[in-house]
Amino acid sequence: MRPNNRENNQPRQIKITRNYTKHAEGSVLVEFGDTKVLCTATVEDAVPRFLKGQGQGWVTAEYGMLPRSTHSRMQREAAKGKQGGRTMEIQRLIARSLRAMVDLKALGERAITLDCDVIQADGGTRTASITGAAVALCDAINSLIENGTLKTNPIKGLVSAISVGIVDGQAVCDLEYVEDSAAETDMNVVMMEDGRMIEVQGTAEGEPFSHEELLTLLDLAKQGCNQIFIAQREALGL
């Protein structure tokens, strides 16, 4: 039996709270069960140097975990003087995922930065970050439309993400920490609302997985992402 008596294809309870802080153009607290991430979107009228004069915008992301977001305190990366490899990998994943949902030409020469700060971690922090940041990005874009900066909406569609894996020989969706730490296979899937995939990250932690198991995991991920899209749309009032 899974934690909280969930079915194998059942994600954790998802809660998305918009306008969680008052300063950012977009601000969301996203909760996947006990995993909680604050996602904020900041709009700047500037683009990276390599995009100057190109007539298009940019979407990027940063990711971090609060020192006591886990069972024992972690040292802040700022105190170490550099970001770890895991952090850089995750924030690049978040940024790639969010750029897929935006027509960068229609955004114009401006940049939107999504900051994803993990308040409490219980597995799936990167997938929760992508899910919450997508909503915060929509709010930031809507603020540009409302103030007349943008005439057309550059959002091409929502993006969501979920973890799947094989635990005790069973394919399961949205792994909690205790499942993730014991998984034979661990996979993160990022999808567009139309079903196209942005990223699939899969690793056999124990036994290699078969082609049939891969297809089963991808089907589970699609089911889970579809439920997340419903939560995102409800949060946005769409």
UniProtKB/Swiss-Prot annotation:
It comes from the Bacteria. GO terms for biological process: rRNA catabolic process; rRNA processing; tRNA processing. It holds the Pfam family RNase_PH. Keywords: Nucleotidyltransferase, RNA-binding, rRNA processing, Transferase, tRNA processing, tRNA-binding. It catalyses: tRNA(n+1) + phosphate = tRNA(n) + a ribonucleoside 5'-diphosphate. InterPro entries: ExoRNase_PH_dom1, ExoRNase_PH_dom2, ExoRNase_PH_dom2_sf, PNPase/RNase_PH_dom_sf, Ribosomal_Su5_D2-typ_SF, RNase_PH, RNase_PH_bac-type, RNase_PH_CS. PANTHER family: EXOSOME COMPLEX COMPONENT (PTHR11953), EXOSOME COMPLEX COMPONENT RRP41 (PTHR11953:SF0). Phosphorolytic 3'-5' exoribonuclease that plays an important role in tRNA 3'-end maturation. Removes nucleotide residues following the 3'-CCA terminus of tRNAs; can also add nucleotides to the ends of RNA molecules by using nucleoside diphosphates as substrates, but this may not be physiologically important. Probably plays a role in initiation of 16S rRNA degradation (leading to ribosome degradation) during starvation. Belongs to the RNase PH family. HAMAP family: RNase_PH. This is Ribonuclease PH. The gene is rph.
